[in-house]
From Swiss-Prot, chain A:
Pfam families: MIR, PMT, PMT_4TMC
SMART domains: MIR
Function: Transfers mannosyl residues to the hydroxyl group of serine or threonine residues. Coexpression of both POMT1 and POMT2 is necessary for enzyme activity, expression of either POMT1 or POMT2 alone is insufficient. Essentially dedicated to O-mannosylation of alpha-DAG1 and few other proteins but not of cadherins and protocaherins.
Effect ascribed to mutating residue 726 to E: In MDDGA2 and MDDGB2
Source organism: Homo sapiens
Any one GO MF annotation of this record: dolichyl-phosphate-mannose-protein mannosyltransferase activity
Name the UniProt record assigns to this protein: Protein O-mannosyl-transferase 2
Sugar-bearing residue positions: 98, 330, 445, 528, 583
UniProt lineage: Eukaryota, Metazoa, Chordata, Craniata, Vertebrata
Record field: transmembrane: 54-74, 100-120, 146-166, 191-211, 231-251, 283-303, 596-616, 643-663, 665-685, 700-720
Keyword annotations: Congenital muscular dystrophy, Dystroglycanopathy, Endoplasmic reticulum, Glycoprotein, Glycosyltransferase, Limb-girdle muscular dystrophy, Lissencephaly, Membrane, Metal-binding, Phosphoprotein, Repeat, Transferase, Transmembrane, Transmembrane helix
Length: 750, 744
């Protein structure tokens, strides 16, 4: 009786253990089952000609690389205007060159590299990158495009080497390389100033070095082993540093490492000390090293971007103090809040702004007809409030009174400086959020009623502490109703000047909407301190920028009634993305996968699942497979399984994401899918050839199959290449157009 | 066969008295004073309205779960449905049978107690451990509160436990008597219980997935069992009913039969049952009601009353000259009809952009005479249906003429008021400036069978593609400002990528226009339509639409005073006040037995750590446990710890408003795990008899403390005793607990 759960599966033999390092692999001894399969393959030359074989090996690799570079760099300069997201990433490259601070939802490495490429190629950062379609004119943009195309070109050789290592079959690797070289989608995506070629470069580099280091497993702690292991770590850091999609490849490497360690741990010939060494090496190379590099990119990012720019408002007041040009930079204000201080109060949630009031009343029918209180994103005199004691109305700035600091838990009154009305709340429903209470300005010259009293509290601090400017996170709790001052983030109608709604929420949940900090602080009786003391430390900056990025990412929500790309559209190549041009006179580039390649990939996934499960069931039933078939099934299950895992990890998480999705998000998954296709067809054709061995032409089946696949993809590329290299003339709906017969799906509009 | 003639008939009853006692105590704790309080408690206000809908057989749509749950609650009904469920705390009128409505959830809660006992026993743990699990279920305050009201969690938990229990029974049968009668019974029951659980609440899917997963692993091991034949010659054997239940034949049964039986019971039966729930639901609620508007016109027309009354007798095929109302298929943000009125777009918008100053076209969410449009043949002038009528087909060119103003639907290269990237849609007024009418539209039937299909009322979903600019008529979803009376904006979308509901329209009301004269036509438009065609949607079409709308319906995330986050559940940092007596301070809270919650989480942590330790040791070939104990430990963990994980962790990914009661299914699995861990510690980790005795004493002490806590919290569970403010304050053990104290 086999064990009920656990244990049994892990000990199965589906382990990618054996193999040799690097190019020698193909020359490995015949003991290896996988290599044995290759040994009998028709492509395999005789033993005597090792030298010739090595030359051939390198020549093929060179050919693949050359072809990849040639296709990617062909007509790279066209169109000479901004295409699609170049407007963002080119602009961000310029920001690095100009050293102005900006905000983006992706980590900085990709844009930093683009900026560096531009800088080295002589681009001066003066082009505005305003909107797609703007001409570059005399500005040098080829450096940035060339850099992206350079990285994008490496995808093909990387995939080639990965498949070669996984399947030990040149034909599988060639097929994969052809699929990727001739895919119009990969080609288009590599030709422009985008993050995707950089991201995919790191993903594939990580995959390749992981596979390489797996095949070095029989020589642990040797130089190549260390090299590939640390290279994996570096690539992981790179992938994560470009986009958070890099997390998926990290997950894949992580799963692979866990399985690997589990295997080593079960190897009783290894002492626990050796296993410990293995563990330490992986922790060092796959956790510590990437983390250090990733942090370093952020350090560089913050060092380079030292000037105030368009991204300031997304960050907290303390953060802004470190940007030169920002009005908080080098400012000096009193550190602790005291009665009589004039302050501005900023909401901690991104893009909400400052507590604001103005001489306009809430309109008839919306709560009480009292003065409006809103939040406002821009600096304005109406953002100023005076903090006063709740029970006295004397002027605390009178020099005869001693300075009295505001402390956590004090009951205060906030008086609007311009209109002398008090911040007030009562049991009327708020204008937009019906479950909350309305907040108004009330009273004349500071005299109101008990609904003007608020308790000021510092989040997570002890009672009695003083309140620090910028650093303290404070809440205002309404004394009578017990509700908390917050902003719902909803835009008020025209009567509220489209500022944001301020409410008093009865739900005492700690959300950022109800937490504020004091930004400006004027009090002549207090000594000013330089804000530099308050500057956040590097870990704080790192944490904050991540919070802002994550919030920005989840804030990219699709609107109702808008066409959005759905993950299920992607593998079937349902619709593309317009990179440039709309009308028939425009130079049009359309991001769309080569349908022959993509539909072949889709078919291959289905075929793989089918054949894989047949083989797995057969093995579980204890079927005795001939040596050759066993070898091929090992390739299919181990090599194919790893690649399939990659595809799964890079595709299915998108179904769970709430943010806006685009077609180009599928491309990392598509790389894995193409590798799977290469492995699958090669193996299936070999199995076919083996099954029909009695037939005289059996060996030819494999060669003919691979050749026809190669030629088929090449021909389809010839048909579809105008999608990537650009087309002018009538649209494909028009029967006159040369592309007319190629609009195979109604949803493609090129 | 005639054996009973030869031997005397003997009935031997095997009664497990502890099981009977447990059931009795369970019933007592759940049914005691069931009708108290005779007032609406918390979510009863929500489920109650659906019970009323069932009683009145009115169609409704609820996104919280499939209809089986509501049906189970309504089963206890038997009243006329006349009660206004609008306020928590409202006194029930005398026509509401409170006892019978609350009976089914209470019974489900009571039966969970003996089932916990059975499950632990079937996991091959001792009678003592099994008793422990059942007694813990018995005194868990949160479970008691939740089962004594018209709420669904206790029923869900009942079916979850039933699914696990019957799977275990089936699995234990598998070893000695596969394909016996009881084997089939338990296997089928597993499938049935799973689909019932899913039918109660979508949450039931989690347990279903768990059972499927465990079954798949077991089936995989079965595949590896080389003593079973392949598809082979024994196929006929297992197909013959005679061999069922015969042990000697079991060796010959093929693997294929095993897999097939599992697939049928665990995949086919649940799907069929799930469809059956909807079938019964749609048969029961056949009258139109307040939720009609959300559904498509075709669906509404299949209900009795409502739209069916209006559309009954409309001509089916739209012809040139037909008068129609056009409803947007997407129905978001509100269902609405294509509309126009005398007013024009303002010359200059507030942001300074200009408009064409032509007649507004909007989407209007109410029935109105201005929603009528006439389908006109561009080549002819008349606005009446010729005889015989010439039906409009896919690909035909049409003009849409607004019935009350006789202006035709037009779009041109002017930015729309709120969506400047799209084209403005207007009804054309000839100002005699160089802006010609562009009012030709090509009709595309989206759900056509062939390219020559006729445009049908209600059934056809159509798009209007503008001939000059190839823009598509679309509902943008934005509300126009005051000049547009806050109606919805209609635009011409130029970049139409594929199918989207907001560009698709269907004819709802329809009649053949007969009067050429404008005055007469206006009168005609004001009068209701008639003539008769029956159109019935098939069950599958209605099911798929209903299911789709239920899943797509998203109530805007309303914050709630008692909503909580999953992290707060494990340590019971939150509670929900369910009910407060109108005069005294007697109150009911959803508040768990904190001793059980904390020790459950502890047991889980211990289980995880111990398992990791054992796994690592086994990997190094050190076997601490004998093989059978190890298998028992793994299976118990897979079901109990796994059950907790699948019922808890997915909530972290959910964006909807969450409440403490969502944690209860996970909690029951934790309670099942507790005695398992305790017995394991006593059996395998206590080395001497002395240690074992000390451990037992500790367990007894711990259990008494749990009992004590349960008893202390009892007034908040049953709400039967009014406590003084002082006593209430003493019960507020955590600052985050919200216990209601009256201010006098």
């Amino acid at each position: 009786m086999p064990p009920a759960t656990g244990g049994g599966l892990a000990e199965s033999e589906l382990r990618p253990r054996r193999g040799r390092c690097g190019p020698q692999a193909a020359r490995a001894a015949g003991r290896d089952v996988a290599a044995e399969a290759v040994a009998r393959s028709p492509k395999r030359p005789a033993w005597g000609s090792r030298r010739f074989e090595a030359v051939g090996w390198w020549a093929l690799l060179a050919l693949v690389t050359l072809l990849s570079f040639a296709t990617r760099f062909h007509r790279l300069d066209e169109p000479p205007h901004i295409c699609w997201d170049e407007t963002h990433f080119g602009k961000m490259g310029s920001y690095y060159i100009n050293r102005t601070f900006f905000f983006d939802v992706h980590p900085p490495l990709g844009k930093m590299l683009i900026g560096l490429a531009g800088y080295l190629s002589g681009y001066d950062g003066t082009f505005l990158f305003q909107k797609p379609g703007d001409k570059y004119e005399h500005h040098s943009y080829m450096g940035m495009r060339g850099f992206c195309a350079f990285l994008g070109s490496w995808l093909v050789p990387f995939a080639y080497l990965t498949v070669l290592d996984l399947s030990k079959s040149l034909s599988a690797a060639l097929l994969t390389a052809a699929l990727l070289t001739f895919d119009t989608g990969c080609l288009t995506l590599s030709q422009y100033i985008l993050l995707d070629p950089i991201l995919m470069f790191f993903i594939m580099a990580a995959m390749l070095s992981m596979v390489k280091y797996n095949s070095c497993a029989d020589r642990p702690f040797s130089a190549p082993w260390w090299f590939w292991l640390s290279l994996t770590g570096v690539s992981l850091a790179g992938a994560l540093g470009v986009k958070f999609v890099g997390l998926f490849i990290i997950l894949q490497v992580g799963l692979n490492t866990i399985a690997d360690l589990w295997y080593l741990f079960g190897d009783l010939s290894l002492s626990l000390v050796t296993v410990g060494k293995h563990l330490t090496a992986r922790v060092l190379c796959l956790i510590v090293l990437p983390l250090a590099l990733y942090t370093a990119t952020f350090a560089v990012h913050f060092m380079v971007l030292s000037k105030s720019g368009p991204g300031d408002g997304f960050f907290s007041s303390a953060f802004q103090a470190r940007l030169s040009g920002n009005n908080l930079h080098n400012a000096s204000i009193p550190e602790h809040l005291a009665y009589g201080s004039v302050i501005t109060v900023k909401n901690l949630r991104m893009a909400i702004g400052y507590l604001h009031s103005h001489r306009h009343l809430y309109p008839e029918g919306i709560g009480a007809r009292q003065q409006q209180v809103t939040t406002y994103l821009h600096k304005d005199y109406n953002n100023l409030w005076i903090i006063k004691k709740h029970n006295t109305n004397s002027d605390p700035l009178d020099p005869s009174f001693p300075v009295e600091f505001v402390r956590h838990g004090d009951i205060i009154r906030l008086e609007h400086k311009e209109t002398s009305r008090n911040l007030h709340s009562h049991y009327h429903e708020a204008p937009m959020t019906r479950k909350h209470y309305q907040v108004t300005g009330y009273g004349i010259n500071g005299t109101g009623d008990s609904n003007d009293f608020w308790r000021i509290e510092v989040v997570n601090r002890k009672f009695g502490n003083r309140i620090k400017v910028l650093r303290s996170r404070i809440r205002f709790i309404h004394l009578v109703t017990g509700c908390v001052l917050g902003s719902s983030g909803k835009v008020l109608p025209k009567w509220g000047w489209e500022q944001l709604e301020v409410t008093c929420t009865p739900y005492l949940k700690e959300t950022l909407n109800s937490i504020w900090n004091v930004e400006d602080h004027i009090n002549p009786k207090l000594p000013n301190i330089s804000l530099d003391v308050l500057q956040p430390s590097f870990p704080e900056i790192l944490l904050e920028s991540h919070m802002v990025m994550i919030r920005g990412n989840s804030g990219l929500k699709p609107k109702d009634n808008e066409f959005t790309s759905k993950p299920w559209h992607w593998p079937i190549n349902y619709q593309g993305l317009r990179f440039s041009g709309v009308n028939d006179t425009d130079f049009r580039v359309y991001l769309l996968g080569n349908p022959v390649v993509w539909w072949l990939n889709l078919l291959s996934i289905a075929l793989y699942l089918l054949s894989g499960s047949i083989i797995a069931v057969a093995m579980q039933r204890g079927a005795r497979l001939p040596a050759e078939v066993a070898g091929l099934s090992q390739v299919l299950l181990r090599g194919g399984g790893q690649v399939l895992l990659g595809w799964t990890l890079h595709y299915f998480p998108f179904f769970l994401m709430g943010r806006v999705l685009y077609f180009h998000h599928y491309f990392p998954a598509m790389l894995f899918s193409s590798m799977l296709t290469g492995i699958l067809w090669d193996t299936l054709l070999r199995l076919c050839a083996w099954g029909l061995a009695s037939w005289p032409l059996a060996r030819g089946i494999h060669v003919a199959g691979i050749l026809s696949l190669l030629l088929g993809t090449a021909y389809s590329f010839y048909l579809f290449h105008p999608l990537a290299y650009g087309m002018v003339g009538p649209l494909a709906q028009d029967p006159q157009s040369p592309m007319a017969g190629l609009r195979w799906l109604d949803s493609w509009d090129f | 066969m005639w054996g009973f003639l030869k031997r005397p008939v003997v009935v031997t009853a095997d009664i497990n008295l502890s099981l009977v006692a447990l059931t009795g105590m369970g019933l007592l704790s759940r049914l005691w004073r069931l009708t108290y309080p005779r007032a609406v408690v918390f979510d009863e206000v929500y489920y109650g309205q659906y019970i009323s809908f069932y009683m009145k057989q009115i169609f409704f749509l609820d996104d919280s779960g499939p209809p089986f749950g509501h049906m189970v609650l309504a089963l206890g009904g038997g009243f006329d449905g006349n009660f206004l469920w609008n306020r928590i705390g409202a006194e029930y009128s005398s026509n509401v049978p409170v006892w019978s409505l609350r009976l089914l959830p209470a019974l489900a809660g009571a039966l969970s107690v003996p089932m916990a006992y059975q499950i632990v026993l079937e996991l091959h743990f001792s009678h003592c451990a099994a008793m422990g699990a059942a007694l813990l279920m018995l005194i868990e305050n949160a479970l008691i509160t939740q089962s004594r009201l018209m709420l669904l969690e206790s029923v869900l938990i009942f079916f979850n436990l039933l699914a696990v229990l019957s799977y275990l029974k089936f699995f234990n049968c598998q070893k000695h008597s596969p394909f016996s009668l009881s084997w089939w019974f338990w296997l089928t029951l597993t499938g049935v219980a799973c689909s019932c659980a899913v039918g109660i609440k979508y949450m039931g899917v989690f347990t279903y997935v768990l059972v499927l997963g465990v079954a798949a692993v077991h089936a995989w091991h079965l595949l590896g069992d080389q003593t079973l034949s392949n598809v082979g010659a024994d196929v006929q054997c297992c197909m013959r009913p005679a061999c069922m239940g015969q042990m000697q034949m079991s060796q010959g049964v093929c693997v294929f039969c095993h897999l097939l039986a599992r697939a049928v019971a665990l995949l086919v039966i649940p799907v069929v049952l799930y469809l059956l729930f909807f079938y019964v639901h749609l048969i029961l609620v056949f009258r139109s009601g307040p939720h009609d508007q959300i559904m498509s016109s075709a669906f509404q027309a299949s209900l009795e009353g409502g739209l069916a009354r209006i559309t009954q007798g409309q001509p089916l095929e739209v012809a040139f000259g037909s008068q129609v109302t056009l409803r947007n298929v997407f129905g978001k943000p509100v269902p609405c009809w294509l509309h126009s009125h005398q007013d024009t777009y303002p010359m200059i918008y507030e942001n300074g952009r200009g408009s064409s100053h032509q007649q507004q076209v909007t989407c209007y969410p109410f029935k109105d005479v201005n929603n009528w449009w006439i389908v006109k043949d561009p080549r002819r002038h008349q606005l009446v249906v010729s005889s015989p009528p010439r039906p409009v087909r896919h690909g035909d060119m049409v003009q849409l003429v607004h019935g009350m103003t006789t202006r035709s639907l037009n779009t041109h290269d002017v930015a729309a008021p709120l969506s400047p990237h799209s084209q403005e849609v207007s009804c054309y007024i000839d100002y005699n400036i160089s802006m010609p009418a562009q009012n030709l539209w090509r009709l595309e039937i989206v759900n056509r069978g062939s390219d020559t299909d006729v445009w049908k009322t209600i059934l056809s979903e159509v798009r209007f593609v503008h001939v000059n600019t190839s823009a598509v008529l679309k509902l943008s979803g934005a509300h126009l400002p005051d000049w547009g009376y806050r109606q919805l904006e209609i635009v011409g979308e130029k970049l139409s990528r594929g199918y989207h509901g907001s560009t698709v329209w269907n004819v709802e009301e329809h009649r053949y226009g007969a009067s050429q004269e404008q005055r007469e036509r206006e009168r005609e438009l004001h009068s209701p339509a008639q003539v008769d065609v029956s159109r019935n949607l098939s069950f599958m079409a209605r099911f798929s639409e209903l299911q789709w709308r239920m899943l797509a319906l998203r109530s805007d995330d309303s914050e709630h005073k008692y909503s909580s986050s999953p992290l707060e559940w494990v340590t019971l940092d939150t509670n929900i006040a369910y009910w407060l007596h109108p005069r005294t301070s007697a109150q009911i809270h959803l508040l768990g037995n904190i001793v059980i919650w904390v020790s459950g989480s502890l047991a889980l942590a211990i289980y995880a750590l111990l398992s990791l330790w054992y796994l690592l040791r086994r990997r190094r070939n050190v076997h601490d446990l004998p093989q059978d104990a190890w298998l028992r430990w793994v299976l118990a963990g897979a079901l109990c710890a796994g059950g907790w994980a699948v019922n808890y962790l997915p909530f972290f990914l959910m964006e909807k408003t969450l409440f403490l009661y969502h944690y209860l299914p996970a909690l029951t699995f934790q309670i099942l795990l507790l005695p398992v861990v305790l017995q394991h510690i006593s059996d395998h980790l206590c080395r001497s008899q002395l240690q074992r005795s000390i451990f037992s004493a500790l367990v007894v002490a711990w259990y008494s403390s749990a009992c004590h806590v349960s008893n202390t919290l009892r007034p908040l569970t049953y709400g039967d005793k009014s406590l003084s403010p002082h006593e209430l304050k003493a019960l507020r053990w955590k600052d985050s607990w919200d216990i209601l104290i009256r201010k006098h």
